[in-house]
Amino acid sequence: MFFAGPVAAQIAVDMGADVIKVESVQRIDGWCGSAFGDTEELPAWEASPFFNRVNRNKGDITLNLTDSWGQEILKHLVSDADVLIENFTLRVMANFGLDSETLKAIKPRLVMISLSGFGMGTS
C-alpha cells in the first residue's frame, strides 16, 4: 500500500529529478517505523533505515489535504511540477478536490501517476 509511491519517487530522484514528498498530518508514513524504535537521541523516523533510504534527497512538506489551505498549497506546487505520483486508494484524490481534471487545468502537461495498492477498478 505505501511502498509503490515512495519507491517510484526515489527512482526519479536517483535519475536526477527534484522531488517533494508531501506527507499527511493525519497519518504517519508507513516507512517511519524503525526496526529499533525510538531511541534516546532520535525519534523512530530519524532512526529508521527504511525511511531514510526511500526518502533520501527528497524535499519534504507536511500538508492537511482535507483542508482547503493544504489543497491550495498542493495546487501551487503542481503549477511548477512535471509529475505527480500518488499512492492513495481509489477516489481519495477526487475527494480532496485534486482529481486529474482539476490538476491538469492548473498544469496541462502534468503527468499523473496513480499507484493504488488496491487496484483502480470499482468492484
Give residue spans per PLM region.
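N-terminal helix-loop segment corresponding to the beta1-alpha1 unit
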Residues: 1-123
